[in-house]
Amino acid sequence: MAGFERFFGKPRKENENTGTHWLTISDLMAGLMMVFLFIAIALMISAFRERDRIKEIAITYQNNQVAIYEALMSEFREDLPRWDAFVDQNTLSFEFRSPDVLFAGGAVEIRPRFQKILNEFFPRYLETLRKYKSSIDEIRVEGHTSSDWIGALDDTDAYFCNMELSQGRTRSVLRYSYDLPDVVDDREWVKKYFAAVGFSSSRIVLCDDGREDRDRSRRVTFRVITNAETQIRKILLDNEEDS
């Protein structure tokens, strides 16, 4: 037996601690896997909750869009033809499209006919939107012009001349509307949420053949912007702060 051991070597005894050593590492790895699994599940739950909240806001936004559009149409449907006005459901823009009624060429002063329209339109417009205040972020009075400008040196010069004109016109419209006696009780809300924006010729209207429709390009719109995008940004920001 001694010779056998000298030739082949002494058989090793199993180290009792070896099994314990590998068992400890296995337990550690299993524990780490469970930790990572719980982290992944927590992240998935958070992502699903964020998705559901954004989806809920998107649905609410769509419902608000439809509700505001239907409210405007219910209030003004019979007036649209005689004002040559139009309500866009996608942008919630109330558009006045008769340039000869709105302003004289190159002028920022509101014509008498448009003043009469605003006298009738603006107080009712505010009253219609009153119930949707909580979902409105801003209401823009937008001024648009054609690309024409008599005496312009080039297209750039015409663009900036029309920019000044469109901004002046929207300020005139907003100031006139703000000063109406029937709006006294809503003036703080008007100051907080209304803005006058001039777009110059950056959003011209095109004919079917692709040419500029100069008359339709000269227009004034009242556009409602809801706060859905703001709410979504707030959700994303809150999640970043929590993470």
Across the structure, where does each feature detected by a protein language model lie?
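Extracytoplasmic beta-rich ectodomain segments of secreted or membrane-anchored proteins
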Residues: 72-76, 94-96, 107-138
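Periplasmic OmpA-like peptidoglycan-binding domain that tethers envelope proteins to the cell wall
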Residues: 112, 144-233
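Short terminal targeting/anchoring segments
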Residues: 1-83
